[in-house]
């Protein structure tokens, strides 16, 4: 018996099956991309509840818009783009709500648990500092930093996801790295 999803030989075939309501195809998409969507949304939002909400919204959007997948980009790029756009929306909504709130915004600062084996080295304190620093970044800077430095996408892939040019990516990445480094230095986490 083959691996789950083995019969879908391309992203287009997989999304075509999702578009016609194939439950097994949707399960393949969920299995393949749920960890990535959860990880990226959590890294951008620094809030577990918001991340869980965005993750659900991403897969609802994939299901509803599956017939709109045209294959110009890889499925992972399309899903990264949906994830980032929903994160931008959430960050904008968070900013608007904070304007009308008397209390300061509350952000979860707990260290990500079991997001990936590579992240085991992140301590709770370092994660708190990272989240604090990332709040000072624009949504685009957060996304570029997350996609490029934390997810390991190359500049061309980041451009496909964000719609930014290579120069804009470099500029946003430089600003994000500088701000995060300054915050880490302030707390003695980087020399």
Go through the PLM ranges and name each one.
Residues 7-11, 97-122:
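Internal acidic/polar
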Residues 130, 141, 156, 160-186:
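DNA-recognition helix of helix-turn-helix
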Residues 2-5, 19-28, 38-57, 166, ...:
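Short, charged helix-capping/linker segments at alpha-helix termini
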Residues 13-17, 129-137:
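Short amphipathic alpha-helical boundary/capping segments
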Residues 39, 53-60, 73-85:
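Structural recognition of an alpha-helix C-terminal capping motif at a helix-to-coil junction
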Residues 68-71, 81-101:
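Arg/Lys-rich amphipathic alpha helix in sigma70-family domain 2
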């Amino acid at each position: 018996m083959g691996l789950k999803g083995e019969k879908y030989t391309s992203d287009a075939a997989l999304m075509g099956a999702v578009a016609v309501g194939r439950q097994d195809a949707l399960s393949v998409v969920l299995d393949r991309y749920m960890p990535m969507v959860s990880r990226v949304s959590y890294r951008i939002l620094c809030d577990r509840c918001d991340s869980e909400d965005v993750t659900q919204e991403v897969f609802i959007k994939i299901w509803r818009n599956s017939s709109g997948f045209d294959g110009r980009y890889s499925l992972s790029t399309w899903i990264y783009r949906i994830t980032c756009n929903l994160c931008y929306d959430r960050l904008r909504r968070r900013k608007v709500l904070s304007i009308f709130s008397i209390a300061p915004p509350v952000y979860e600062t707990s260290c990500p648990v079991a997001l990936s084996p590579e992240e085991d080295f992140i301590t709770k304190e370092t994660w708190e500092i990272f989240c604090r620093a990332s709040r000072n970044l624009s949504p685009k800077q957060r996304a570029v930093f997350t996609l490029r430095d934390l997810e390991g996408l190359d500049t061309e892939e980041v451009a496909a996801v964000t719609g930014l040019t290579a120069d804009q990516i470099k500029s946003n990445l430089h600003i994000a790295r500088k701000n995060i480094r300054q915050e880490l230095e302030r707390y003695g986490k980087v020399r």
